[in-house]
Amino acid sequence: MGIYLNNSKTVFLALLLLIISLLYSSTLHAPFNYDDEVVIKHETAQQFGSSFITGKTEVGFTTIYPFRYRHLFYSSLVLNYALGELHPFGYHLVNTTLHFFTSIVIFFIAFITIEKGLSLNRKDALSIASITALFFSLNPVHSETVNYISARAVGMSSFFYLSAFLSFILGSFRERKPLSRFLFYLLSLTCFLASILSKETALTFPIALL
């Protein structure tokens, strides 16, 4: 039974990857839109891309402006620029990949909370979690976060926010394994900090745990 469920998870995640890839494949070569011109071409990539490539990071990574408090978000744009300069494909690929991994986190959050919280058998929990993750991945409300490159801050923050929540849940089920529990809580804290460095709204995470 355990092997069957593990295989089912693998098949579903592969199917989820295929669905998301097909859904957003037409947007991978879409041009920059709206604030992308300012955020990527002027504010971030062109100003800090050359310093990133040459290793002269004293300008790009030690000044608050224009990085503000979204250091991780802007750093991801700089890395994109270092690898592909101003070709939109790489930027869109990162956003789509983030959406896929966020959907995976949603799947595991749903699976664990349903199995443990509602005391359902693993097969039923797997079915409900799969539907939940599928609805999340296909929900058109996320299309802006995926297609709009400058909205990556939302996608990154959401991924780390939900990862912090998942890690906290996993840690809470490790009462008899202190070391494992500590490591999951440490991972949760790390993801929480990464979420804040992506978008400031992640500061609500401690309240969400109450």
What name fits each language-model region?
Residues M1-L210:
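Polytopic membrane enzymes that build or remodel cell-surface glycoconjugates and lipids
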